[in-house]
Amino acid sequence: MRGAYYVLAALLVVASSQIAAEFGHQLPVYDDGIMAARNAVVKTLPKRYLRGGHDVHDDSANEERSLYSVLVSLINEGVMKLPRATEELNMMPRAADDVEVMFRPAEVNEEMPHITKEELKKASKSAKEALKKLWKPASRTAADGHASHDIPTGEKLYLDLEAWDIKEFHMRGGSVIKKHRSMIASVHQEFLNLCDPNLHPTAAETSLLWGMFHWKPELCTIEIHGRNLMRLAKRDVQKGVLKITSNELLDNQWNQLSDTHKLSVQNCLLNLYYQRWVRMYNIFKRNRPDLIAAPLNLELNLGTSSALALRKHSQVPSNAASTSNVKSSVITKRSKRTFDSNTGTISLSSKQAKMQSSKSVVPLLTGATTSGEHVVPMQNLKLSLGGPSGGFAPYEPPKAHSLKSLTPASTALTLEDSETKLSLGGIYDKRTDKAPSVP
């Protein structure tokens, strides 16, 4: 720092002398720090140095030389880098041209086709629906139907004490669902053939799994089905604990266990029951035994009312006539009557029409009749009016009047097959309070 101080002082002196020379002034001359005065005794004083600088007398000179050498080296280094800097300056225009040639995002977007808002909304909606679908990795049983969408069997469940306090006894499971009772036998047998012998599902369990696939579409997901299977497994565990508490000896042993031990036992049983339910669910989902027995499942395919009517009519044979002794009923399966007016065809229901008689049998009218004295009890004739299977019979000219003789009770009544075909529906006469009489 001392060398720099001296350099600055010298520069100031030179600058001040130049300024004084320009204005015609002359600076006083100093000699070793003593200014000559008039009539003064001149006495030289010893040289003074800065603090700590009297040991080395040429320290300032050395610092000045070192500063000069540093400046020279910096100047030389800068001069050596000038050619390289010049080359870089010359290359800058070419680099700018290359940058202009490069594609910018704005230019790329301008070349893209325009997409309307409706198309964008449609694409976004489709993407959201696709993300909602859960695609599980295919397992080693991927060759069997939809095994890739099965509920994983390696999941471990754990419930705390608060969750076990919630009872699941309100869940269905003790009996078959009402709408499955007519078909549960065939579906259960088919399900038994598909399952392993160690699973051995019951009819009630088959009905539960069957019903899960008839839930609302928004509820038929793997997550919701998995939670329902967990609740079923929890209910099975709670039913087992209830049986233990009903036995006094087992109840005492169970109460002696700590809460932690009880929790471990319940969770272990929960996973065992859950794995069983998951295996049965996956088998039922892949094979759908309820669809294998679909031809017999009329209630689920046609509705309850239509299925019952179709089943009842299908049980009626083509030839229907039976006889009995006196004071017995004559059961007629099918009959056909034709009137002379545009009344179409009257068809009896498939239920057995029982006509009671004490001494003789009520005459069965099979021919075309227009008048007569014998009256058929209308309360025994159950007509199926209208319905989806009803139809309009074309007009036919009246046929010749004929009446078959009355048959005694001991004689069998036979009906012609050609006139006993089953006819569902028809147009009937409005006046049904009185049957046509026989001439």
Curated annotation (Swiss-Prot):
Motif RxLR-dEER location, chain numbering: 48-65
Superkingdom of origin organism: Eukaryota
Signal peptide bounds: 1-21
Predominant localisation class: secreted
Cell location: Secreted; Host nucleus
Record keywords, A-Z: Host nucleus, Secreted, Signal, Virulence
GO cellular component terms given for this protein: extracellular region; host cell nucleus
General function of this protein: Secreted effector that acts as an elicitor that induces cell death in host plant cells.
Domain notes: The RxLR-dEER motif acts to carry the protein into the host cell cytoplasm through binding to cell surface phosphatidylinositol-3-phosphate.
Family: Belongs to the RxLR effector family.
The name this protein goes by in its record: Secreted RxLR effector protein 117
Organism: Plasmopara viticola
Underlying gene: RXLR117
